[in-house]
Amino acid sequence: MLAHLRPALVLLLVLTGLTGFAYPLLSTAIAQAAFPHQAHGSLVRKDGRVVGSTLLGQPFDDPRYFWGRPSATSPVPYAGQASAGSNLGPTNPALAEAVKARVDALRAADPEGAAPVPVDLVTASGSGLDPHISPAGAEHQVRRVARARGLSEAEVRRFVARHTEGRLLGLLGEPHVNVLLLNLALDGAR
């Protein structure tokens, strides 16, 4: 009987060693050598302190800052360990209520704004942790941020334009703005 089990056990041990140890170690070593910044989480530092990551959204609610997409993680917003969508379907009344509350909050923050609220500012992404908003989402907030910072709308629009990333290879994805990097650039302006 042991003769029949031996090949299976040897294969189990070999594959465990290869896929459980050798492959992860090799992948990590290659990532550390080729892409050290990304391998460490694409961390953003300010004055020597880590203030965030370009890969994860953060809650911003101060009028001086651009606000990102809503987080679907709860009870703590933007908690990586709770990453998931809200799983609320389009016909679920709770989704409609949440979107309406978010629209109302954005309108209250900029009562003079009459433009429709871009959908990415009121709906969570699939992961609930998206660090980006659309250029339309940024444009929707320009007046509020400019007023709160004492800048002209044209100045704030220039910041948005400088921080708008295009499509990958010119055709994949949509143009987007990293909210953390934009807010840090605005902080550095004055």
UniProtKB/Swiss-Prot annotation:
Residues that span the membrane, as ranges: 10-30
Keyword flag Cell membrane: yes
Localization in the cell: Cell inner membrane
Disulfide bonds: none
Swiss-Prot/TrEMBL keywords: ATP-binding, Cell inner membrane, Cell membrane, Ion transport, Membrane, Nucleotide-binding, Potassium, Potassium transport, Transmembrane, Transmembrane helix, Transport
Predominant location category: membrane
GO molecular function, one term: P-type potassium transmembrane transporter activity
Topological relation to the membrane, as annotated: Single-pass membrane protein
Domain of life: Bacteria
InterPro entries: KdpC
GO cellular component annotations of the record: plasma membrane
NCBIfam families assigned: kdpC, PRK00315.1
Family to which the UniProt record says this protein belongs: Belongs to the KdpC family.
Cited function: Part of the high-affinity ATP-driven potassium transport (or Kdp) system, which catalyzes the hydrolysis of ATP coupled with the electrogenic transport of potassium into the cytoplasm. This subunit acts as a catalytic chaperone that increases the ATP-binding affinity of the ATP-hydrolyzing subunit KdpB by the formation of a transient KdpB/KdpC/ATP ternary complex.
Subunit-structure text: The system is composed of three essential subunits: KdpA, KdpB and KdpC.
Name recorded for this polypeptide: Potassium-transporting ATPase KdpC subunit
Protein source organism: Sorangium cellulosum (strain So ce56) (Polyangium cellulosum (strain So ce56))
